[in-house]
């Protein structure tokens, strides 16, 4: 596996996770 594609995959996972956490926190409040 290429290191660049691996870095992109990690970046997308972190971005999606943080985005869902923000939406979750706002709906929770």
From Swiss-Prot:
InterPro entries: Cytochr_b6-f_cplx_su8_sf, Cytochrome_b6-f_cplx_su8. SUPFAM superfamilies: PetN subunit of the cytochrome b6f complex (SSF103451). GO terms for biological process: cytochrome complex assembly; photosynthesis. GO terms for cellular component: chloroplast thylakoid membrane; cytochrome b6f complex. The chain crosses the membrane at residues 3-23. Pfam families: PetN. Keywords: Chloroplast, Electron transport, Membrane, Photosynthesis, Plastid, Thylakoid, Transmembrane, Transmembrane helix, Transport. GO terms for molecular function: electron transporter, transferring electrons within cytochrome b6/f complex of photosystem II activity. It is found in: Plastid, Chloroplast thylakoid membrane. It is a single-pass membrane protein. Belongs to the PetN family. Component of the cytochrome b6-f complex, which mediates electron transfer between photosystem II (PSII) and photosystem I (PSI), cyclic electron flow around PSI, and state transitions. The 4 large subunits of the cytochrome b6-f complex are cytochrome b6, subunit IV (17 kDa polypeptide, PetD), cytochrome f and the Rieske protein, while the 4 small subunits are PetG, PetL, PetM and PetN. The complex functions as a dimer. This is Cytochrome b6-f complex subunit 8. It comes from Drimys granadensis.
